[in-house]
């Protein structure tokens, strides 16, 4: 069979019969990526990476380029969809113990970090008020690095402040990183197919597997259709639902935006960053909030892979989900009285649940279930 490998990749791949809708998000992410690369290319064709022209070039795209408004909206809304899907995909991995497939999990978290970097660079490109101040705030985090901080920041900016060289290099990075994402995704899929998908029971029933196509591919197609329908509803009716009003005015280095809130995608991480008053401490907490996911296979103390039969861990899991939603909400609010303390408590409970309560609950469940 000459095309054996390609067939094995999608057609003849043996998959458990009982995987649920939570397993459809991988193919949805692949579709998001394809959409982002396609629309991104057409946007890049009309974009000008110059601080005096960037904002105008996007206005020109939306107004004058045929279907430019569609490309721009699809790219912006598609990015938010990408993040919604990836967070659900990770939550599924946490719930069903998919992180026990270590190589796949590590490549996935690396993908998440690359994706967040790409989204940040993309957010800077329109050169609106929020773009400019987000760039200022986030790049200034590098100054928290001891000894090298200031030199690193100057090197990244290409000068002593955010200026034309900064925008040019951010555009270059935003263009090249998706290719890294594509290669990492391919690696992610290849590594997954080494061991095969998990399933809600957390078992590996080799005797009860069916081919991916046509059984699961049609199920994937259903969720894909729903996602594309959502995109096509949001695009014409609520195109600016994920945008920030401040980003509709051109960047002005002299007037700071009211509250520099990060994009919807990274609001959860931003809340953790600013809940710590110390600069270096905040940066470390920000990094730790994502890097802690690398530790998940080490923190797994249960004898059962999945949380399906572990009620205590389930309660903790849904508390963690709620916690992340609270962090996301706080991250989009101004830094004032109630939000500061809420953010600090939510950040604390985030790390507490992952690093302490999950392993302890699993040990207790082992005892209760006499495993």
UniProtKB/Swiss-Prot annotation:
GO MF term list: metal ion binding; ubiquinol-cytochrome-c reductase activity
Give the Pfam families listed for this entry.
Cytochrom_B_C, Cytochrome_B
The portions of this protein that span the membrane are 25-45, 69-90, 105-125, 170-190, 218-238, 280-300, 312-332, 339-359
Q: What is a single cellular component term in the Gene Ontology annotation? A: mitochondrial inner membrane
Q: Which InterPro entries match?
A: Cyt_b/b6_C, Cyt_b/b6_C_sf, Cyt_b/b6_N, Cytb/b6-like_sf, Cytochrome_b, Cytochrome_b_N_euk/bac, Di-haem_cyt_TM
UniProt: a ubiquinone binding residues: 193
Q: Which UniProt keywords apply?
A: Electron transport, Heme, Iron, Membrane, Metal-binding, Mitochondrion, Mitochondrion inner membrane, Respiratory chain, Transmembrane, Transmembrane helix, Transport, Ubiquinone
Disulfide cross-links = none
Q: Where does heme b b566 bind?
A: 89, 188
Q: Kindly state what the record says about how the cofactor is bound.
A: Binds 2 heme b groups non-covalently.
| Gene Ontology biological process terms in this record | mitochondrial electron transport, ubiquinol to cytochrome c
PROSITE patterns in the record: CYTB_CTER, CYTB_NTER
Location in the cell reads: Mitochondrion inner membrane
Cofactor requirement: heme b
Residues at which heme b b562 binds: 75, 174
Q: In the UniProt record, does the keyword Magnesium occur?
A: no
The way this protein sits in the membrane is described as: Multi-pass membrane protein
* Subunit details: The cytochrome bc1 complex contains 3 respiratory subunits (MT-CYB, CYC1 and UQCRFS1), 2 core proteins (UQCRC1 and UQCRC2) and probably 6 low-molecular weight proteins.
Q: Which family does it belong to?
A: Belongs to the cytochrome b family.
Q: What else is known?
A: Heme 1 (or BL or b562) is low-potential and absorbs at about 562 nm, and heme 2 (or BH or b566) is high-potential and absorbs at about 566 nm.
- State what this protein does: Component of the ubiquinol-cytochrome c reductase complex (complex III or cytochrome b-c1 complex) that is part of the mitochondrial respiratory chain. The b-c1 complex mediates electron transfer from ubiquinol to cytochrome c. Contributes to the generation of a proton gradient across the mitochondrial membrane that is then used for ATP synthesis.
This chain belongs to the protein called Cytochrome b
């Amino acid at each position: 069979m000459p095309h054996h490998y390609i067939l094995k990749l999608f057609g003849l791949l043996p998959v458990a019969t009982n995987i649920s809708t939570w397993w459809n998000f991988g193919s949805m992410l692949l579709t998001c990526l394809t959409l982002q690369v396609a629309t991104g290319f057409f946007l890049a064709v009309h974009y000008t990476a110059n601080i005096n022209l960037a904002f105008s070039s996007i206005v020109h795209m939306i107004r004058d380029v045929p279907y430019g408004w569609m490309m721009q909206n699809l790219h912006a809304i598609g990015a938010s969809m990408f993040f919604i899907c990836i967070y659900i995909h990770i939550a599924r991995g946490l719930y069903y113990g998919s992180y026990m497939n270590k190589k796949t999990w590590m490549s996935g978290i690396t993908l998440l970090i690359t994706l967040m970097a790409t989204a940040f660079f993309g957010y800077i490109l329109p050169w609106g008020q929020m773009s400019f101040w987000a760039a200022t705030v986030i790049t200034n985090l590098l100054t928290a690095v001891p000894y090298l901080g200031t030199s690193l920041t100057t090197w990244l900016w290409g000068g002593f402040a955010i200026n034309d060289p900064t925008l040019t290099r951010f555009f270059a990075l935003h263009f090249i990183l998706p290719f890294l994402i594509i290669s990492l995704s391919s690696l992610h899929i290849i590594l997954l197919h080494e061991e095969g998908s998990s399933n809600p029971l957390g078992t590996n029933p080799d005797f009860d597997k069916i081919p991916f196509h046509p059984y699961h591919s049609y199920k994937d197609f259903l969720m894909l259709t729903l996602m594309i329908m959502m995109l096509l509803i949001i695009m014409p009716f609520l195109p600016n639902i994920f945008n920030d009003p401040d980003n509709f005015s051109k960047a002005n280095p002299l007037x700071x935006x009211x509250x520099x809130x990060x994009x919807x995608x990274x609001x959860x991480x931003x809340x953790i960053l600013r809940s710590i008053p110390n600069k270096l401490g905040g940066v470390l907490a920000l990094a730790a909030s994502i890097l802690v996911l690398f530790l998940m296979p080490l923190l797994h103390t249960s004898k059962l892979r999945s949380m399906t039969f572990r009620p205590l861990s389930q309660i903790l899991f849904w508390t963690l989900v709620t916690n992340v939603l609270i962090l996301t909400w706080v991250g989009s609010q101004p830094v004032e009285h109630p939000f500061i303390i809420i953010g600090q408590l939510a950040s604390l409970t985030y790390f507490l649940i992952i690093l302490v309560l999950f392993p302890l609950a699993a040990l207790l469940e082992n005892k209760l279930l006499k495993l």
